[in-house]
């Protein structure tokens, strides 16, 4: 801070002892000093007291150049004139000298008393501070001195490189400031033994020479200079971010920041060059950069200490030493990595922090499934994965000669779906195996270190013998006669017919118009495609069919028709064209007459045959009741079960009324070529075979994700009918909340049903995995979708019979869709009273009581099941009635008990559940009513905030249906835990049901 003196003299005032509220009292032991006259002992005693009270330590960021309190010998200061400033030399209680100067020439005019210090080295500092501690007498307290007494004195300095250059004239000194006292003492202070000590600080800079002198000028004050301290400020040495910053003298300017570079401590390296800034006040500011302990060392208490054995640090960027990862060790200090144990490995690309692993053991329990066109393999992952998660599988196919006992690798004739190497799934399909061939498939589990292990391969073998397979592709196709409107082709049998060729299927289309193609079938190896455009390129593909099914199409062959010839040739075609037109007209007339005569009945023209019976009663005996293919876009009035259905009203048709299920499936479903489907992985097992996910790419359409159900090998005719019936049922439905049938594959093996793919799988499993993750509105949205789908089925006259959360599929957008339409159900007299299907038992806990007792399945019984589904959704997939037996469930429902409300269930939803569980089926709501109710709840979310209270849950908890005999359970809590209802214990206790006798009395009332 700049003062009034020249060359940057600064003024700082620090109110110390004697200033403000910090006025010390003179000790009683020194009270006698104040009774003496002003001169002599009194003044000396006073100065001693002041000196004894000011021996204080300096701050760590201040370096003293001079402190008169600590000088043991003579100060060497000079006073002139000699009768001016007077040195008082005393010692303290430790016999240390006390240097004090006083002057009190207040009665004489024109005082000019100087006190000069010895030469003071600045030690390289360009800015220094002077701290003065002094006392001053109040002029008003001195009788007779008002005209000559002053209450200030002056301080000067003079720079010099010479420590012996004290012969300085007064005018050569540079004034720093005029010093005034904040407080002065009076005679009263002496009487009260109070001493008022002033502290003033001034700064000077910038300095340019090695040292300087100070001078104090008295002009007529009564003053005692108790101590003089001269110092400079520095930023003290410090360790920050593992960098050492040395003592740094502050700059000359009070606002200057000096940038200082740090040096890294031992065993550390530079990350970003460490820097800090030293402020004028001696404080470190603005740290930049840092050092890091090098590899093998960690930071502790500002130093880098070595990593102990068993620990390592791979990089300076790591913070601390880490314990060696699993299956590795180190016995050295300062380790940067750990060594793998015997038989364990780490890849070069693996970081040192990764655990050492070993190759996995062999896969387990491999099984095979063989059909005419492929081999399916499935297995369980290895018991020992080697410690890693990167297990994949490699399939090695060997073709074996059973007589010679020799095996060779299969080569390229076998295709692996999805792949042979790097397989992540535990299943694979091999396509195009040879018929009647012995294969050995070696399934090897590998991971990232398998190549590093010198040990033997770990694999499981599966031996397979194929039966008759579909034919291999046709490879050799030759063109025959080519005209402007026709192309003749011939070809050879496939290299591997794998049986008797029944026929060939030829597919052709104009180039670049693949979506519009024509199919020709031929029992010979030659065909002629007619009706083609002149001068056009056509693409042909051929495949063969045996009893095992169709093979794959051949590669594409391109042939071009000849161009149209000249005018004469065109004229020659006129008679032919005329004949063709005439023949066409005749054929058209014959067909019209044929239809009008009612002969279509004899040809089995499908639903139109029932119209024939109306128009031509005499033909009824010939037509019978027949169902055949009809254009799905065509809407006609037809008979069904004795009722007339008007055009535009869709009604469910039971596919079992068809003599041939293939006819039904082709009427309601679309045939898809197997080559359009890519199987990716097995996702489950259905009633009739495996369920897989894959991709469907139809010509001219975008690729779709699909799910496929396959008909297992060795199926019976009844199984085939039931399998196709499910597709026939599904194909009749078109609703966003009903699973969509994409098509069927019936012309090749395996027979497949292709549906849309639902990413999240079954609803019950999905809810269990995401327990508590959805809002009430989201749950109601799911229920609304299910209800909308069931309303659609009800409107079509279809009764589902097995509505449960497990039969609801949910996609990635949380859209729920009703599925599982293919089960036939038979009521058996088993102790569980469950419906048995070929896929297993369906528990009766979802089934309405009238359906259990009288086999009355209606839309109303589906509504009961829907209420159970609501309970499953709100409880996030809990099992209805928990662990109660089916007989207990039947008894409880018949006696009027119902499932309790799930926890935190909105009252409106639980009331809807109870409505669905009305014993009288006519009292239950229709699905149309349910959809409307849920729509209202969604539009008014506040109506869902009212929850079912605790006491109402107790009344529906099926108390007496858990063997409540007094000896069965010792406490209510034990009974609730046994029935999987332990979370309701607190509710029972709060409502007074603390004993088994009390629980046994629970009724609906």
From Swiss-Prot:
Signal peptide extent: 1-26
Residues reported to bind ATP: 683-691, 709
Subcellular location: Cell membrane; Cell projection, Axon; Cell projection, Dendrite
Tissue-specific expression: Almost exclusively expressed in the nervous system. Predominantly expressed in neurons.
Keyword Cytoplasm: no
GO BP field: axon guidance; cellular response to follicle-stimulating hormone stimulus; cellular response to forskolin; dendritic spine morphogenesis; ephrin receptor signaling pathway; hippocampus development; negative regulation of cell adhesion; neuron development
Intervals, Cytoplasmic compartment: 597-1005
Pfam families in the record: EphA2_TM (PF14575), Ephrin_lbd (PF01404), Ephrin_rec_like (PF07699), fn3 (PF00041), PK_Tyr_Ser-Thr (PF07714), SAM_1 (PF00536)
Annotated function: Receptor tyrosine kinase which binds promiscuously GPI-anchored ephrin-A family ligands residing on adjacent cells, leading to contact-dependent bidirectional signaling into neighboring cells. The signaling pathway downstream of the receptor is referred to as forward signaling while the signaling pathway downstream of the ephrin ligand is referred to as reverse signaling. Among GPI-anchored ephrin-A ligands, EFNA5 most probably constitutes the cognate/functional ligand for EPHA5.
UniProt protein name: Ephrin type-A receptor 5
Natural source organism: Rattus norvegicus (Rat)
The encoding gene: Epha5
């Amino acid at each position: 801070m700049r003062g009034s003196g020249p060359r940057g003299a600064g003024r700082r005032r620090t109110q110390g002892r004697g200033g403000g509220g910090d006025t010390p009292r003179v000790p009683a032991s020194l009270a006698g000093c104040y009774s003496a006259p002003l001169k002599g002992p009194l003044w000396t005693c006073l100065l001693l007291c002041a000196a004894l009270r000011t021996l204080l330590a300096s701050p760590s960021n201040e370096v003293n150049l001079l402190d008169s309190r600590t000088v043991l010998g003579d100060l060497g200061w000079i006073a002139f004139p000699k009768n001016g400033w007077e040195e008082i030399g005393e010692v303290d209680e430790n016999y240390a000298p006390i240097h004090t100067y006083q002057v009190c020439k207040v009665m004489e005019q024109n005082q000019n008393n100087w006190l000069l210090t010895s030469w003071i080295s600045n030690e390289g500092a360009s800015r220094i501070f002077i701290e003065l501690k002094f006392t001053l007498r109040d002029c008003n307290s001195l009788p007779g001195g008002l005209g000559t007494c002053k209450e200030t004195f002056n301080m000067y300095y003079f720079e010099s490189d010479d420590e012996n250059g004290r012969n300085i004239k007064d005018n050569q000194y540079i004034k720093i400031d005029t010093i005034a006292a904040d407080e002065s003492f009076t005679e009263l202070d002496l009487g009260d033994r109070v001493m008022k000590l002033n502290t003033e600080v001034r700064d000077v800079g910038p300095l340019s020479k090695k040292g300087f002198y100070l001078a104090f000028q008295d002009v007529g004050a009564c003053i005692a200079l108790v101590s003089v301290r001269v110092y400079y400020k520095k930023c003290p040495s410090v360790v920050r971010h593992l960098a050492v910053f040395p003592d740094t003298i502050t700059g000359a300017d009070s606002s200057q920041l000096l940038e200082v570079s740090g040096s890294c401590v031992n065993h550390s390296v530079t990350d970003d060059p460490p820097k800090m800034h030293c402020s004028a006040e001696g404080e470190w500011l603005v740290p930049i950069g840092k050092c890091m302990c090098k590899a093998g060392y960690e930071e502790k208490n500002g130093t880098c200490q070595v990593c102990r054995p068993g620990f390592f640090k791979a990089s300076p960027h790591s913070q601390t030493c880490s314990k060696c990862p699993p299956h590795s060790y180190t016995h050295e200090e300062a380790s940067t990595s750990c060594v793998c144990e015997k038989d364990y490995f780490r890849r070069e690309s693996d970081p040192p922090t990764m655990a050492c692993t070993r190759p996995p053991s062999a896969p387990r329990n491999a099984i095979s499934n063989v059909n005419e066109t492929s081999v399916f393999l499935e297995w369980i992952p290895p018991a020992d994965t080697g410690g890693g998660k990167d297990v994949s599988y490699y399939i090695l196919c060997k073709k074996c000669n059973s007589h010679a006992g020799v095996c060779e690798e299969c080569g390229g004739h076998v295709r692996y779906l999805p792949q042979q190497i790097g397989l992540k799934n535990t299943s694979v399909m091999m396509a195009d195996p040879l018929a009647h061939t012995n294969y050995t498939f070696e399934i090897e589990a590998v991971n990232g270190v398998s190549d590093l292990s010198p040990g033997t391969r770990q694999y499981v073998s599966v031996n397979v013998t194929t039966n008759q397979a579909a034919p291999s592709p046709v490879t050799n196709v030759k063109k025959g006669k080519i005209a402007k409107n026709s192309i003749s082709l011939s070809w050879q049998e496939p290299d591997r017919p794998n049986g008797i060729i029944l026929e060939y299927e030829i597919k052709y289309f104009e180039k670049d118009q693949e979506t519009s193609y024509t199919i020709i079938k031929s029992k010979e190896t030659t065909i002629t495609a007619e009706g083609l455009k002149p001068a056009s390129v056509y693409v042909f593909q051929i495949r063969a069919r045996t009893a095992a099914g169709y093979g794959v199409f051949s590669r594409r062959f391109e042939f071009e028709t000849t161009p149209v010839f000249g005018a004469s040739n065109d004229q020659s075609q006129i008679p032919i064209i005329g004949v063709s037109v005439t023949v066409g007209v005749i054929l058209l007339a014959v067909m019209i007459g044929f239809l009008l005569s009612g002969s279509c009945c004899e040809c089995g023209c499908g639903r139109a045959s029932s119209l024939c019976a109306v128009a031509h009663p005499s033909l009824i005996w010939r037509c019978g009741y027949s169902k055949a293919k009809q254009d799905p876009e065509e809407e006609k009035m037809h008979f069904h079960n004795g009722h007339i259905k008007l055009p535009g009203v869709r009604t469910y048709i039971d596919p079992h009324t068809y003599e041939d299920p293939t006819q039904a499936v082709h009427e309601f479903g679309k045939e898809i070529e197997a080559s359009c489907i890519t199987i990716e992985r097995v996702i489950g097992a259905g009633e009739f075979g495996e369920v897989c996910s894959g991709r469907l790419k139809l010509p001219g359409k975008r690729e779709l994700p699909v799910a496929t159900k396959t008909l297992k090998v060795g199926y019976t005719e009844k199984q085939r009918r039931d399998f196709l019936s499910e597709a026939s049922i599904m194909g009749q439905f078109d609703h966003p909340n009903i699973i969509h049938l994409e098509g069927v594959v019936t012309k090749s093996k395996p027979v497949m049903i292709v549906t849309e793919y639902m990413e999240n799988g079954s609803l019950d499993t999905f809810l269990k995995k995401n327990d508590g993750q959805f809002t009430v509105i989201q749950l109601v949205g799911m229920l609304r979708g299910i209800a909308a789908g069931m309303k659609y089925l009800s409107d079509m006259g279809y009764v589902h019979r097995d509505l449960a959360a497990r039969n609801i599929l949910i996609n990635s957008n949380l859209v729920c869709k009703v599925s599982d339409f293919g089960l036939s159900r038979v009521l058996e007299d088993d102790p569980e009273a469950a419906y048995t299907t070929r896929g297993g038992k369906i528990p009766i806990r979802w089934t309405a009581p009238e359906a259990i007792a009288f086999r009355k399945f209606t839309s109303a019984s589906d509504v009961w099941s829907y209420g159970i589904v609501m309970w499953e959704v709100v409880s996030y997939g809990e099992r209805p009635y928990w662990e109660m037996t089916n007989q207990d469930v039947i008894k409880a429902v018949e006696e009027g008990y119902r499932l309790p409300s799930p926890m935190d269930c909105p009252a409106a939803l639980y009331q809807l559940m109870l409505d669905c569980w009305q014993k009288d089926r006519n009292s239950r709501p229709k699905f149309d009513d349910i959809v409307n109710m849920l729509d209202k709840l969604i539009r008014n979310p506040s109506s869902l905030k009212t929850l079912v209270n605790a006491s109402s849950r107790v009344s529906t908890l099926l108390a007496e249906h858990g063997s409540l005999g007094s000896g069965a359970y010792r406490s209510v809590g034990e009974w609730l835990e046994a029935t999987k209802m332990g979370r309701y214990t607190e509710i029972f206790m709060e409502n007074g049901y603390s004993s088994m006798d009390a629980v046994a009395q629970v009724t609906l009332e």
